[in-house]
Amino acid sequence: MALGQYILVKLETNRTRSSRLLNRYPKIIGYPIYATDFLFNRMIPKLSITKRVYFFLTKGKSRVLSLSEGLARLFSCGFEVIDYIKIGDETIILSKKIKEPAYDTTPTYGLLVKLDRIGQNGEILKVFKIRTMHPYSEYLQEYLFEQHGTKDGDKIEKDFRVTNWGRFMRKYWIDEIPMVWNWVKRDLKLIGVRPLSEHKFNTYPEYLQKKRVRYKPGLIPPYYADLPHSVEDFFEVEEKYLNAYEKNPIRTDLKYLFKALYNILIKGERSR
């Protein structure tokens, strides 16, 4: 397909499919039908040992995707999403070809993912996490940031890439447990600014970018010590921490560690 051409994609999302099946039949019939459809058209296509057989038999015609994965796959194939609308049981997506496909051989697909993050001296780190988003979600980050911005300088507002079980895991930091391995490898220190994706890093003011890359990122960010409520507050919190760390690293990290633990354990602060 040539650059500049438009394409309309018709998609029945996983939520629409589940609602359609469960509303069509009585519960005693609907739930077994939905479970079978979920297994065959959503899980089997994702498993490496079964997906080839699935696509050979179905050509992918009945495969079920989330809205997030559907949009993200278009971006990964070099398309820009112009707009999308839900009509009945189908979502219609208008897209424009703007570049060549990414040909990504390692998209965020499995349970455990390795994410590229900016580390000390601007080096790229492979950070380990449990996947809490729909597959290919990294391709939607810039699009959603432009559409919704952030709610507190950290997380994207109205981020539909996050799954229901992913929200629970994020709330209690379960998804970040594999990052302990990065700490063991000394890619990260215990307290420090959060390792960022390239896109997120580039949204920071240049002066703060330069300060960030002087030091290793951390497992526990200063966010949980000072609890910012806006983008401006978020930048100020990070700058305040980095300035203090530059003057007295050990005392600063101990201060922020105990303050973060107090907010989490005593005041009940959770990931937002």
What are these regions (language model features)?
Residues 115-160, 220-240:
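Short, glycine-rich, amphipathic interfacial segments at transmembrane boundaries or analogous
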Residues 87-140, 250-272:
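A hydrophobic, helix-centered structural microdomain
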Residues 34-63, 260-272:
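Low-complexity, charge- and small-residue-enriched intrinsically disordered regions
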Residues 50, 55-84:
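Short alpha-helix
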